[in-house]
Design a protein with these regions (language model features):
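ATP-binding N-terminal substructure of ATP-dependent carboxylate-amine bond-forming enzymes
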Residues: 1-78
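Short secondary-structure boundary segments
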Residues: 54, 129-130
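Conserved ATP-binding module of the ATP-grasp superfamily
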Residues: 100-103, 124-127, 141-167
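Glycine-rich beta-alpha junction loops
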Residues: 15-16, 112, 131-133
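Glycine-rich phosphate-binding loop signature in dinucleotide/nucleotide-binding domains
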Residues: 42-47, 120-121, 160-161
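A general structural signal for well-ordered alpha-helical segments in protein cores
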Residues: 35-38, 59-63, 87-91, 114, ...
């Protein structure tokens, strides 16, 4: 049976989207990656259920913070969102539980061992930034990287930015 309660839709967005706004009772432009801000807004608006779409708020713990204040959430908590947000976490999980499909890999946060591991792999490898990069953190040999020299240069860029990466 459908609920007879009146429904309201609130949206917390990073920018105004007229297509979404026309379906909402209220749209607020703000930092939906900030758990404190989202919780404050949810209390103010009387939110009882939240649907979180983007990965960034999941990675920053917004779902966890909402659950703590009694708001039901469609979207994983931070530790479960790591399956999508951390390449290293996912690869380690596949390895730990012997789940098929996990490629040979190593995780790096410095250049130590990078050249040697690339030599072991030959010409078939992928370098992935470990974290959220909006789809821009993956480079594939033959498509984006045409030599080990280019791969090493990309890895150096990631290290200089303070990033961890997976090969």
């Amino acid at each position: 049976d459908r609920s007879t309660h009146e429904k309201e839709i609130y949206c917390l967005a990073s920018n105004m989207n007229p297509g979404i706004a026309e379906h909402c009772d209220e749209i607020l432009i703000g930092n939906f990656n900030d758990p404190e801000f989202v919780v404050s807004y949810s209390k103010e608006a009387g939110i009882t259920i939240a649907i979180i779409g983007p990965e960034n708020p999941l990675a920053s713990g917004v779902a966890d913070a909402l659950w703590k204040v009694g708001v039901k959430v469609v979207g994983p908590k931070k530790n479960l969102a790591q399956l999508e947000t951390s390449k290293a976490f996912t690869r380690d999980l596949l390895k730990e539980y012997a789940i098929p499909g996990g490629p040979q890999y190593q995780t790096f946060d410095s250049m130590n061992g990078v050249a040697s591991f690339l030599n072991d792999l030959g010409e078939n490898y992928v370098v992935k930034f470990d974290g959220l990069a909006g789809g821009k953190g993956v480079k594939v040999s033959g498509d984006h990287l045409y030599s080990h020299r280019e791969a090493i240069a990309y890895c150096k860029e990631l290290v200089e930015k303070g990033g961890e990466f997976v090969i």
